[in-house]
C-alpha cells in the first residue's frame, strides 16, 4: 500500500473531497486509511464507569485508499511510484519526481 501513517494526503472523492489532512492509521489488509477529521461518524457508547450517562462520540471512519492522493513536500498531489536508491526501495512522486521517504 502506497500510503503510510503520517503522510499528508488530499481526499479526491466523497463528501470530504478536497480536504488535506494527515493519515492517522493505515489498514493494509482492507486497503483503507483513517485520515484526521475526514469521514466523521457518530458512535453511541453504552454507559460505563467512566461515563454513567453514555455518550455519542464523533470519530473518524476508515476510507478507501483509492480516495486519497499523497502530497509531496511542496503540497502537490500526484501518483506514487517506487524506485531503488542506494540499494533501498523508496517512494517518489511521479508528478514531481521528489523522493518521499
Swiss-Prot record:
InterPro entries: KOW, Rib_uL2_dom2, Ribosomal_uL24, Ribosomal_uL24_CS, Ribosomal_uL24_KOW, Translation_prot_SH3-like_sf. GO terms for molecular function: rRNA binding; structural constituent of ribosome. Part of the 50S ribosomal subunit. One of two assembly initiator proteins, it binds directly to the 5'-end of the 23S rRNA, where it nucleates assembly of the 50S subunit. One of the proteins that surrounds the polypeptide exit tunnel on the outside of the subunit. The keyword RNA-binding applies. CDD domains: KOW_RPL26 (cd06089). SUPFAM superfamilies: Translation proteins SH3-like domain. Belongs to the universal ribosomal protein uL24 family. GO terms for cellular component: ribonucleoprotein complex; ribosome. This is Large ribosomal subunit protein uL24. The gene is rplX. One of its GO terms (biological process) is translation. Pfam families: KOW, ribosomal_L24. Keywords: Ribonucleoprotein, Ribosomal protein, RNA-binding, rRNA-binding. NCBIfam families: rplX_bact.
Amino acid at each position: 500500500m502506497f500510503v503510510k501513517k503520517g503522510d499528508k494526503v488530499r481526499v479526491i472523492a466523497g463528501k470530504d473531497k478536497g480536504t488535506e489532512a494527515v493519515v492517522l492509521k493505515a489498514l493494509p489488509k482492507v486497503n483503507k486509511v483513517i485520515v484526521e477529521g475526514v469521514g466523521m461518524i457518530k458512535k453511541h457508547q453504552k454507559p460505563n464507569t467512566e461515563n454513567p450517562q453514555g455518550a455519542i462520540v464523533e470519530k473518524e471512519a476508515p476510507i478507501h485508499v483509492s480516495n486519497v492522493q499523497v502530497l509531496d513536500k511542496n503540497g502537490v498531489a500526484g501518483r506514487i511510484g517506487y524506485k531503488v536508491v542506494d540499494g533501498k526501495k523508496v517512494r517518489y512522486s511521479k508528478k514531481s519526481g521528489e523522493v518521499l521517504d
